[in-house]
């Protein structure tokens, strides 16, 4: 299904938002039946020190064999995997919910996305965070964004 065929009910802007909080809201909306598009995934943030975050994702990327588990390196894949972890994706309703979510690097949609309540970086009391683009570069993804 191409971008032109995906008609989103809700467009969410992940710029300067905490990835886990956005992902949980998106998963909840997808389970409710909404078609959700997440834009600017590369600018979402993960809280924690740079060393801790990089260590976690490096361990995941190096884990697995030829038969899996497979962990994505690109920001859109990392974000979608976080959403998948919040859905019962092995059941029919969870699989349908995951299919109704699209994550994009940049903003290919005609409209600007909404910033969800409680997901903004402003709520942090610390300045320790890493963007998904930095994590992807550390994992060795081809930087095309």
Swiss-Prot record:
SUPFAM superfamilies (alphabetical): Ribosomal protein L13
Keyword annotations of the record: Ribonucleoprotein, Ribosomal protein
Biological function: This protein is one of the early assembly proteins of the 50S ribosomal subunit, although it is not seen to bind rRNA by itself. It is important during the early stages of 50S assembly.
Alphabetized HAMAP family for the sequence: Ribosomal_uL13
InterPro entries the UniProt entry points to: Ribosomal_uL13 (IPR005822), Ribosomal_uL13_bac-type (IPR005823), Ribosomal_uL13_CS (IPR023563), Ribosomal_uL13_euk/arc (IPR005755), Ribosomal_uL13_sf (IPR036899)
One cellular component term from this protein's GO annotations in UniProt: cytosolic large ribosomal subunit
Protein name: Large ribosomal subunit protein uL13
Family, as annotated: Belongs to the universal ribosomal protein uL13 family.
Subunit-level organization: Part of the 50S ribosomal subunit.
Gene Ontology terms: biological process: negative regulation of translation; translation
Pfam families per the UniProt record, alphabetical: Ribosomal_L13 (PF00572)
Organism classification: Archaea, Methanobacteriati, Methanobacteriota, Stenosarchaea group, Halobacteria
Gene Ontology MF terms: mRNA binding; structural constituent of ribosome
